[in-house]
Each structure stands twice: as C-alpha cells, then as structure tokens.
Amino acid sequence: MKRLLSVMSFAAALVLVVACAPQETGTAEAAAVPYGANKEAGATFVHDGVTLYYETYGRGEPLLLVHGNGGSIGTLAAQIDHFKAKYQIIAMDSRDQGQSADSHEPITYEKMTDDLAALIEHLKVGPVDVVGWSDGGVEALLLGVRHPGKVKKIVSMAPNLNPGPEAFDPEVSALFKSMTELSDKARNTPEGRRQHKVVGMMLKEPNIPPAMLANVTVPTLVLASDHDLVRLEHVVAIYRGLPNAQLAIFPNRTHLIPFDDPAQFNATIDRFLATPFKEIDLVPETMGSYEKLMTGLAR
C-alpha cells in the first residue's frame, strides 16, 4: 500500500511538473526565462512531414537535452539554465508534444529518435553530447544505436528497454494504464488525442533487444534513483549491456530528481561530461589504490 501511494503521489507530481515546469522548476533565472515559449530562442524545421519546434541557448560544445513523456522544453528549465553557461544547448519538443505538430500517425521511440538526429543535421552540429530523462533517456540510447556518428557522450536517466514486468513493478504498469484511461476520456479534443497517443505509447514501447546495447560504443552514463519508477535491476542490466558505461544511483530520490534536486542531478552530469572517460580495470586499480593507502599510512 505504501508503495502504491508513493506511485500515486508521483502521478500527481508529474502532472504538476509537466503543466507548470516553466514557472516552477529550476532557479529564479530559469523561471524568468520562458523556456519552451521563447520566441527569441525558438525556431522550427520539418522532418518526416512533421513541423518540430526547438530552442537553442548559449555557446560552446553542443549539448542536446531530451525531455520525458508528455513533456516539453519547459520541463528542462533547470538543466538549460545550468548548462547554457558552458555549452550550446539544443532542446526540442518531441513530435506530438509541446509546440511540435501532431504527426497524425502512431508515435514511436524510433521516430522521435530520428527526429533528434534530423535536428542535429539541420543545425549542422555534431557529434553532440546528449542528456535524456525518462523517455528522453530511451531516445538517448537509441541515438547511440541508430545514429552513432552523431553522439559523443550519452547520459540516460531511468531508461527502459521494454514496458514489461522486468522494467516496471505491477503497480507502476497499472499507473500507466490508468493514465491512458484518463486521457482516453479526453480524446474529443485535439490536445486530448495527443495526450492519449503519447501516454499510450508507454504501454507498448519501447521494444529494444538487450543485445542491441552492444552497438552503443560511446561513453554512457546510466542514471536512476533508488526510488525510481523503473526497476533498479532493469537499469543495472542496461548499464551492464553497454560496453563503455558508468552507473550512478541517487540515494533517497525518485524519478523526479531533475526537478526535486537539480543541483545534484546537474552536478553528476557535469562531472561525467567534463571528465575523460576511463574504463576501470577492477582488480589492478583496486590493488593500486590499496597500495597507495597503505604507503600513506606507513609514513
């Protein structure tokens, strides 16, 4: 029951985050900048017959930020505000979400991923670092699979390879189903139809074979919280399936850590992006550190 109440609380929080992010997430400066509705930073382009809205901020190496299911650029306010001082930030409303157009066809993670690749091509940047949260974490991994030449480093927060019981506990799957049923009742409006399509996707997708992770050869940081929606066992399996990966689990946090504790979330990403990737050779490096410790104590 406690776990179910926690999941229900998450649902309420997620609705508030998606609805209010431009005003209520990030720093005071982020609240003052209308991320997701900034005419000075926004533009559109067309890919696969769909008009897609994006915004860019800052200068430096390109960093692509990818929002979660039903979200928009506005939900990335705390991340845009933090990283724009160091990077050229690129953020896009996924098809059927935010200010991007309705695709008038079923939505898939592969289509959204190909939209991101097209945006990179459109802006003539790349390869880029990419940070994705939730659905965006799935798209970040798929960029590494489908468009490996367009990415340098990947940060994937709480991704899943499929919507099955290995990824989600039964009460979480029930939550997704109830959210779909609620959106189904609103399908008489254009926005309601969009929401039903996007939320309903979570019940059927993604469908990424675990063996496909071996194709993601760029350095990848896999993130999750210890009270996440995605089962930790599933997240760890994703980490282990990636050939050049690091893993970080946020203690006493939830799926909403980018909004609840953006300082910790952003700092973890900062370190990964700024530090050259190094694969740890477990036994030799552990023993080397141990010898240094013992030498220091002997002095």
Regions found by a protein language model. Give the residues of each.
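Conserved loop-alpha-helix segment in the C-terminal half of the alpha/beta-hydrolase fold
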Residues: 224-253, 296-299
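Catalytic active-site module of serine/aspartate enzymes centered on a nucleophile-bearing elbow/loop
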Residues: 251-299
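Conserved hydrolase catalytic core segment
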Residues: 126-164
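Conserved HGGG/HGGXW glycine-rich cap/lid loop of the alpha/beta-hydrolase fold
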Residues: 50-99
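C-terminal motif of bacterial Sec signal peptides marking the signal peptidase cleavage site
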Residues: 18-19
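Active-site loop/oxyanion-hole signature of alpha/beta-hydrolase fold enzymes
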Residues: 91-131
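Short beta-strand/loop motif that positions the catalytic acidic residue
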Residues: 216, 222-224
